[in-house]
Curated annotation (Swiss-Prot):
Protein name as catalogued: Interleukin-2 receptor subunit alpha
GO BP terms, alphabetized: activated T cell proliferation; activation-induced cell death of T cells; apoptotic process; cell surface receptor signaling pathway; immune response; inflammatory response; inflammatory response to antigenic stimulus; interleukin-2-mediated signaling pathway
Predominant location: membrane
Protein localization: Membrane
Length: 272
């Protein structure tokens, strides 16, 4: 029964003349290790009146809170009230059917963030005040034009490549959320930034790839030394061969000179 009443409220709100709010069909996109939060809520946003375990809405209580107002002031209509449940099974979920309307959920950020003071803009409501025995998680139904901001959870660091925000837009008659440009990585993974010195690791604690690089470098040095030694030995051998050739040539010249001198001596004797 409560689900049908909520659906009737949604349809009535959308069909009332002058109300141009269009509900977003999907949830804001999810980013690993990040949460999103709205700094302010556009007029037409609805918040389910959910109670924590062991409590339920009072029978005459509102099913949801609605952000309404005019050009100068916006506020939340209705009030959520919870009372103790008589039995465990009397608590009812105040959410529309999945095929009719999906739930909009937000999670508290790890630290406050105020990128834009949207609450001061016309047509926006601030965060609704808490009510007694409220559920731990709030379920919103966002409208077109709503903006949510993303932040990395504790233990992760943001690597911005663009705006860390998402906006619900209407495109070709269908609603869609823009994709936030945010990447969250572990602090250990992003500790090394340009300009930071990387700690020196001992050879024993180095990975196998680094050890193989060291072995390869050592082998290369050994091969270089061997090549240099071989070149030196080759050069020495060539030098020895050249010296031997010069000595052989000198001896040959001396022998030829001796033979020539002997022939001249013989000719001179015959002439006498």
């Amino acid at each position: 029964m409560d689900s049908y009443l909520l659906m009737w409220g949604l349809l009535t709100f959308i069909m009332v003349p002058g109300c141009q709010a269009e509900l977003c069909d999907d949830d804001p996109p999810e980013i690993p290790h990040a949460t999103f939060k709205a700094m302010a809520y556009k007029e037409g946003t609805m918040l389910n009146c959910e109670c924590k375990r062991g409590f339920r809405r009072i029978k005459s209580g509102s099913l949801y809170m609605l952000c309404t107002g005019n050009s100068s002031h916006s506020s939340w209509d209705n009030q959520c009230q919870c009372t103790s449940s008589a039995t465990r099974n009397t608590t009812k979920q105040v959410t529309p059917q999945p095929e009719e309307q999906k739930e909009r959920k937000t999670t508290e950020m790890q630290s406050p963030m105020q990128p834009v003071d949207q609450a001061s803009l016309p047509g926006h409501c601030r965060e609704p005040p808490p009510w007694e025995n409220e559920a731990t998680e709030r379920i919103y139904h966002f409208v077109v034009g709503q903006m949510v901001y993303y932040q990395c959870v504790q233990g992760y660091r943001a690597l911005h490549r663009g705006p860390a925000e998402s906006v619900c837009k209407m495109t070709h008659g269908k609603t869609r959320w823009t994709q936030p440009q945010l990447i969250c990585t572990g602090e250990m993974e992003t500790s090394q930034f340009p300009g930071e010195e990387k700690p020196q690791a001992s050879p024993e604690g180095r990975p196998e790839s680094e050890t193989s690089c060291l072995v390869t470098t050592t082998d290369f040095q050994i091969q270089t030394e061997m090549a240099a030694t071989m070149e030196t030995s080759i050069f020495t051998t060539e030098y020895q061969v050249a010296v031997a050739g010069c000595v052989f040539l000198l001896i040959s010249v001396l022998l030829l000179s001796g033979l020539t001198w002997q022939r001249r001596q013989r000719k001179s004797r015959r002439t006498i």
